[in-house]
Structures are given as C-alpha cells and as structure tokens.
Amino acid sequence: MAKAKFERTKPHVNIGTIGHVDHGKTTTTAAITKVLHDTYPEQNKAFAYDAIDKAPEEKERGITINISHVEYETEKRHYAHVDAPGHADYIKNMITGAAQMDGAILVVAATDGPMPQTREHVLLARQVGVPYILVALNKCDMVDDEELLELVEMEVRELLAEQDYDEEAPVVPISALGALDGDQKWVDSILELMKACDESIPDPERETDKPFLMPVEDIFTITGRGTVVTGRVERGVLNLNDEVEILGIREKSTKTTVTSIEMFNKLLDTAEAGDNAALLLRGLKREDVERGQIIAKPGAYTPHTEFEGSVYVLSKDEGGRHTPFFDNYRPQFYFRTTDVTGVVTLPEGTDMVMPGDNVEMSVKLIQPVAMDEGLRFAIREGGRTVGAGRVTKINK
C-alpha cells in the first residue's frame, strides 16, 4: 500500500487526554505517538511513557503545573497534544489555560467504568469550554465480556449527555499497552481512535476569523501626528482607515479611525491576530485612552461588571495566600493588561475558600471590562497572583 502523501499545510488542532487517575491517559498518549511514528515515520516522533509522565514543570501566570506537550500528524491534521499526569495538574491546566483544547480524548478503563474523576474532568471541560469530547475505552484486552463493555459505554454516554456533550460521540475500544507491545489488533485500535479524532473533532475557529480586538498596553503622543496605542492583537484583522471603538474601564466608549498601522517601525496596511502593533488614532488626546481598555471593531464587544467565574486558588507553596478568604473578599481581577477591583460572592453553602481549592464565584467589578465567556483572568493582591480563573457566565 502506497504511503499517503502528507500535506505541509494541514489544519492544526489542540487536543488532550483527560480522565480518572490510572485509567491510562499517559499510556494512551504514548501509544498514539508510537503507532503514528510506525505508520508515518517521517512526520512523527515516538514518545516513551516516561518522557511524557515526567513532564517538566511549567509556570503559567505564576502557577506551577506539570504538563507534557507532544505533537503528531495524521493524514488530515497536525495535532498538539497535552497530557497532565496529576489530577491537580489537570485542574490547574484547565482553569489557567496553560493549554487550550479544541477537543479532548476521555480515557475510561473498561475494567472500571467511569469513576469520580472521570465525571469531574468532563464537568470541568464543560466549564472551561472544551468544545468536543470523544472516548477511548482503554484496557479492553482485559475484558472478555461484551455485555460489560456495552454497559460501560452506556454509562460513559450518559455522562457526556449530562454535560451537554455529543452523546453519539465515538467510543473507541483500545488497549494502549497492547498497542505499545505491537499487537496488531490494538495497533489498529489506536489508528481507529485517531481517525475518530480527525472526523469528529471540529476544525477550530481561527482567531483571525473573529471580530478585531486589541488590548491597550501603552499610549504615547507623537507631536504633530496624534495619539498612538500599542498592544498585541488578540483577535481578528484590522485594515488601515478602519473605524474602531475604544471600550472598557470607563463609562462611555469612544469611536475613532486608525490612520496608521506600524509594526517594528514599518508601515503596514493590516494588522492581524498575533501581531504586536502600534496604531495611530485620529483626533484622540493622550488622556482619552488608558491601559486596560480595548480597541475593537465597533459593536462587536460589550463591557460588563458582573460575571461568574471558575477559579483555582493558589496554595501557600505556590506563592498564594496563607489563609482562607470569605464572602465579600475584594481582590484585584487582572484582565488582559490591567487590574480592576471586584467583590466576590461565594456560592451558597460555601463559607470560605482555602488556598489550593477550586471554586465557582460571582464577581462584581467596580469598572466595566470588555469580556465574553471563556476570558481568563488572574486574581491579585498587591500585584501578587493568588488565583487564576475564567469567566463562565456573564450576568450584567
């Protein structure tokens, strides 16, 4: 059989393994890299279990997370795959967004069925906006009973449905160890799993396709020319002479026109997501704009003051608080480029939150911030990060 020709311009998808401890997340990751390496050697490196399991520590917004990144290619796509070995690491990663996932492989051991962490991981995936989950039913080499497999599959589908995931998602029976040992039946099961990823996980929406948004980092005046703002374009594309809206932090938003776009001292016609750009804004004074506001396509974004968030509170060892906090806690919420004070309301029945906990909270900010669901923030006290979270719902 002729090897499939690989295209260099394949769509890129971020993916990860989630599921209960000891159900085989890391072994599954290792099996995927080995099987793809054996199938398409030019495009893929094999990663051994140990290399993935002993993940280097990463710092994301001041939080230390053990997380492993591997990459691989199928015929259709290029994947970046994250595997967070520990349960606490997984939670921290999901909430701080050290790695965004476009889809997840939920690993469930056929010998156990769904366990408490399986449920918790699916719930968290829903809260933090992982768009799609499919299932690798692992350790199938250890189960001879077809009825038992069907039962486990049913339970997993119920669990997905509970969190509004696709109840009809692929559930692929695999044996990660069998595949690593080279047993052809299980090697094929991993190829089947990857085919399911290719076909079921939707192509991610690219940041450039969304309406233009750039957080303001710096402002300065160029004598005789006007006010320039700089920042990194977060979303969309901006063209020269486009009308933009400046919003957030202040009561009213302002409209203006971009009369020049510069990057690395070169004049450009456009700036797009990922670019560090300097924009010259027509008719604006230095005091008309401040750090923490956003420059955006008019009407595309709205500032809000009240929201709900999913938050991980740093432990003392991570440089967080040494003591719990209570209802009406008033820290700073750091969105994009600035701190805004907010008042915290804890959920009913929660009297206090300990360092190291994760919690759902309602927040009322004293100044509006342009936000939508999924926006990440840090919680700070005097410039020190004590928590990390993301917006799960906007209330006002």
Curated annotation (Swiss-Prot):
Key word Nucleotide-binding present: yes
InterPro entries referenced in this protein's UniProt entry, alphabetically: EF-Tu_GTPase, EFTu-like_2, EFTU_2, G_TR_CS, P-loop_NTPase, Small_GTP-bd, T_Tr_GTP-bd_dom, Transl_B-barrel_sf
Binding site for GTP: 19-26, 83-87, 138-141
Keywords: Cytoplasm, Elongation factor, GTP-binding, Hydrolase, Magnesium, Metal-binding, Nucleotide-binding, Protein biosynthesis
Disulfide bonds: none
A Pfam family it matches: GTP_EFTU
GO CC annotation, single: cytosol
Span of domain tr-type G: 10-205
Region of interest (G1), residue spans: 19-26
Region G5, annotated ranges: 175-177
Region (G4): 138-141
Top-level class of the enzyme under EC nomenclature: hydrolase
Catalytic activity, reaction form: GTP + H2O = GDP + phosphate + H(+)
GO MF entries: GTP binding; GTPase activity; translation elongation factor activity
G3: region residues: 83-86
Cell location: Cytoplasm
NCBIfam families linked to this entry: EF-Tu, PRK00049.1, PRK12735.1, PRK12736.1, small_GTP
Quaternary structure (record): Monomer.
Name of protein: Elongation factor Tu
Organism: Corynebacterium urealyticum (strain ATCC 43042 / DSM 7109)
Lineage of producing organism: Bacteria, Bacillati, Actinomycetota, Actinomycetes, Mycobacteriales
